[in-house]
């Protein structure tokens, strides 16, 4: 009986010990589980921070890129910088939230709140400062209580932007302007509807080259008239033959117009303007439309010319070389009522011709002819016919014109009436002669020919064909009839290739004007970002 009671007590004691032991084990197990969950939350927090740290720069840059393309697509700028900033910060907030959602997938006990997103300019227009607050909350029932973790994450740093499309340049038009205009008086302009080509001669007494943006080049010049039909300023076709030649800085400009393109045309008189003082790098010379025919031999144009024999083009000059006989001649033929002008270098050997001639001929046609009648003394000849007394005449002392470049002129007024003139490069007359006994009325090509002779060659710098007219022009002295130009402008070509990126080197300049910040440009430069004197990038295309 005594033994049984002791056994029962012992068994009960074992049960108590076992219960306590297993309860202790279970408690320790749950404690470890809770510790694992706490570490898991800590690891997740680090993942969130790393995710934000890795992605936030791209998120911010994407926000600006998105804002740029929104403006470009809708063709509508933000009304104020605050509206642009609100759009960008909203984009940053949404994209940051989306990025966190991807990390948070499957964690229902975690929540977060992006409570503040702010962007501000820095002293580098391509660097913005970002301030962002993110509050992360984790709540979880544990075996031994409840885990509540609150973690604020603060982003407070500068972010470098790159390759942000510039909608300001993309959507706006920019213009070259001209500072001055000079009046050119015109006389004897025919009262018909035909285009006429005439020349203007500038020099140091009638044109102030120093008022040009670049006096060494005619690139900035424009010649304008007035379209009396549309009542608009028009750009007239022109070509600068000579620029600032000689002691008097003579410039020769050829212009083409009709009476309806001249200001105040009345009884043969009117005027046009030459514009100058502009930064434009665009040369608007248009010799192809200034003349009936033109070539300056930058290359051989098979649409204009045929050829036989040998020729070379070097430094924009064509040299026809005799060999067995060589000729370069136009595909089109021309009759009377034309004036042919060219700059050429004849050499002292038989036989060379430039004018209206059949190819490979020095007698079937009319024009300038280097010819040797005696066999030992080739001279410059003016050919007006084929035989007898109608053949033409020599230029006196013609050797002075050989092996040098001069400007030669032939007016084919009619079959019988022809006029020959030699000019220097400033269109001063060196020699002139007229004939009334011509007998060649046929249509001929314009030909440049060197016939059979070992040493014969002739070189032409440029050549053009125009109408015959008696138009004259006068240019008032410096200070007279010069006015500020207020009306004419030309749209600047956007020579950027591909997308135009804000602050791209070589295409922008740094200015201390916050309307040129990227946010300022998002408002079409109508508002500044934060402070008016913060730096920004001004597109060079906007410079005059």
Curated annotation (Swiss-Prot):
- Keyword vocabulary terms for this entry: Signal
Secretion signal span: 1-22
One Pfam family name is DUF2341
The yes or no answer to whether the keyword Signal is present is yes
Q: Which InterPro entries match?
A: DUF2341 (IPR018765)
The protein's superkingdom reads Archaea
Its name, as the record gives it, is Uncharacterized protein MJ1472
State the organism named in the record.
Methanocaldococcus jannaschii (strain ATCC 43067 / DSM 2661 / JAL-1 / JCM 10045 / NBRC 100440) (Methanococcus jannaschii)
């Amino acid at each position: 009986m005594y033994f049984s009671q002791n056994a029962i007590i012992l068994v009960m004691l074992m049960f108590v010990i076992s219960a306590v032991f297993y309860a202790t084990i279970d408690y320790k197990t749950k404690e470890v589980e809770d510790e694992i969950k706490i570490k898991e939350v800590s690891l997740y927090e680090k993942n969130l921070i790393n995710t934000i740290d890795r992605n936030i720069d791209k998120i911010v840059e994407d926000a600006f890129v998105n804002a740029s393309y929104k403006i470009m697509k809708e063709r509508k700028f933000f009304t104020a910088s605050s509206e642009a900033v609100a759009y960008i910060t909203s984009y940053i907030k949404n994209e940051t939230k989306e990025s966190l959602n991807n990390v948070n997938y499957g964690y229902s006990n975690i929540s977060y709140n992006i409570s503040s997103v702010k962007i501000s300019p820095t002293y580098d227009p391509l660097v913005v400062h970002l301030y962002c607050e993110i509050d992360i909350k984790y709540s979880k029932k544990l075996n031994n209580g409840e885990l509540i973790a609150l973690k604020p994450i603060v982003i407070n740093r500068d972010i470098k932007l790159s390759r942000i499309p510039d909608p300001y340049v993309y959507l706006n038009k920019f213009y070259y302007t001209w500072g001055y205009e000079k009046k050119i008086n015109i006389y004897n302009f025919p009262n018909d509807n035909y285009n006429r080509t005439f020349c203007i001669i500038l020099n140091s007494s009638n044109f102030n080259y120093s008022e040009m943006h670049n006096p060494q080049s005619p690139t900035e010049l424009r010649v304008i008239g007035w379209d009396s039909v549309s009542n608009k300023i028009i750009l007239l076709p022109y070509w600068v033959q000579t620029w600032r030649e000689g002691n008097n800085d003579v410039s020769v400009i050829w212009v083409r117009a009709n009476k309806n393109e001249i200001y105040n045309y009345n009884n043969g008189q009117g005027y046009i303007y030459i514009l100058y003082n502009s930064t434009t790098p665009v040369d608007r010379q248009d010799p192809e439309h200034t003349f009936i025919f033109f070539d300056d031999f930058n290359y051989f144009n098979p649409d204009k010319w045929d050829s036989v024999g040998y020729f070379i083009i070097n430094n924009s000059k064509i040299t026809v070389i005799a060999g067995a006989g060589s000729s370069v001649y136009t595909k089109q033929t021309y009759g009377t009522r034309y004036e042919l002008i060219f700059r050429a270098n004849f050499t002292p050997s038989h036989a060379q011709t430039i004018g209206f001639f059949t190819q490979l001929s020095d007698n079937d046609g009319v024009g300038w002819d280097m010819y040797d009648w005696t066999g030992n003394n080739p001279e410059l000849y003016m050919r007006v016919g084929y035989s007898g007394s109608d053949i033409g005449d020599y230029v006196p002392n013609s050797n002075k014109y050989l092996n040098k470049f001069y400007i030669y002129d032939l007016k084919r007024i009619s079959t019988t009436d022809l006029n020959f003139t030699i000019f220097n490069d400033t269109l001063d007359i060196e020699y002139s002669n007229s004939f009334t006994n011509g007998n060649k009325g046929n249509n001929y090509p314009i030909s440049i020919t060197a016939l059979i002779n070992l040493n014969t060659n002739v070189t032409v710098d440029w050549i053009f064909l125009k109408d015959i007219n008696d138009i004259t022009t006068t240019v008032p002295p410096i200070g007279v009839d010069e006015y500020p130009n207020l009306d004419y402008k030309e749209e600047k070509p956007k020579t950027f290739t591909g997308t135009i990126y804000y602050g791209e080197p070589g295409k922008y300049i740094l200015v201390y004007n916050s309307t040129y910040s990227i946010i300022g440009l998002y408002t079409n430069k109508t508002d500044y970002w934060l402070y008016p004197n913060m730096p920004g990038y001004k597109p060079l295309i906007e410079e005059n």
